[in-house]
């Protein structure tokens, strides 16, 4: 739903400070896990933003995002060649400055409902002879569709999931920070060519009101 914004000053000045922290593949357990086709990961990103002038009101906000989980090659422990697994969760916390700025698209690309939730979790099967892979589970469409690798360098959410999709889909569609049940088929005959198709639950909240308590 598009929000109508009124009585907002034209000039808005933002001060931002982003503090990304990443901790991956650390410790003896993770080293052992890698030998068994297991990768345990933890990433933390935080940011402080201030609306100094303009917008709806001035003020400062803080956002934090912790991502954690594991990825496993099931060929080594179970003999399921070409099969991989991902289980992940996330912790969103803090209070951003979106309401202070009066934005339609997020000023921050890590802002969302404060919650600890199950995140991307799927099983993928690769068929090497046909150059195909099939992935199914809790998926994010913006991980593989309508996105650019270079967009990760920017803070503003307009560089991520396109507005023409989010504004015309119930509860923004299957994108950060709510995955949806779905499946994706990828055909990649070589490094220069690929085609893919995906099917996703159209309402990842399963609620027309976007109630964050549903998930």
Regions found by a protein language model. Give the residues of each.
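Residues that define the transmembrane beta-barrel architecture of outer-membrane proteins
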Residues: 36, 48-50, 60-66, 115-119, ...
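Transmembrane beta-barrel strands of outer-membrane/channel proteins
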Residues: 40-48, 85-91, 134-140, 195-201
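Residues on the lipid-exposed face of transmembrane beta-strands in outer-membrane beta-barrel proteins
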Residues: 42, 68-74, 120-125, 136, ...
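Transmembrane beta-strand segments of Gram-negative outer membrane beta-barrel proteins
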Residues: 30-52, 83-87, 95, 157, ...
């Amino acid at each position: 739903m598009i929000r109508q914004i009124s009585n907002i000053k034209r000039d808005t000045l933002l001060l931002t400070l982003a503090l990304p922290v990443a901790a991956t593949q650390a410790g003896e357990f993770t080293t052992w896990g890698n030998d068994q086709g297991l990768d345990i990961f933890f990433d933390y990103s935080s940011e402080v933003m201030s609306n100094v002038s303009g917008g709806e009101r001035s003020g400062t906000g803080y956002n934090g995002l912790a991502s954690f989980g594991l990825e496993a090659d099931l060929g080594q422990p179970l003999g399921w060649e070409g099969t991989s697994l991902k289980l992940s969760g996330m912790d969103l916390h803090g209070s951003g400055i979106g309401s202070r700025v009066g934005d339609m698209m997020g000023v921050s690309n890590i802002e969302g409902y404060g919650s600890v939730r199950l995140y991307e979790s799927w099983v993928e099967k690769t068929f090497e002879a046909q150059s195909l892979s099939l992935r199914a589970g809790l998926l994010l469409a913006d991980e593989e569709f309508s996105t650019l690798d270079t967009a990760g360098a920017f803070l503003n959410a307009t560089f991520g999931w396109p507005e023409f999709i989010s504004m015309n889909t119930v509860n923004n569609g299957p994108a950060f920070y709510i995955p949806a049940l779905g499946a994706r088929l990828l055909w990649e005959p070589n490094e220069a060519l690929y085609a893919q198709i995906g099917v996703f639950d159209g309402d990842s909240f399963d609620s027309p009101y976007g109630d964050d308590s549903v998930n």
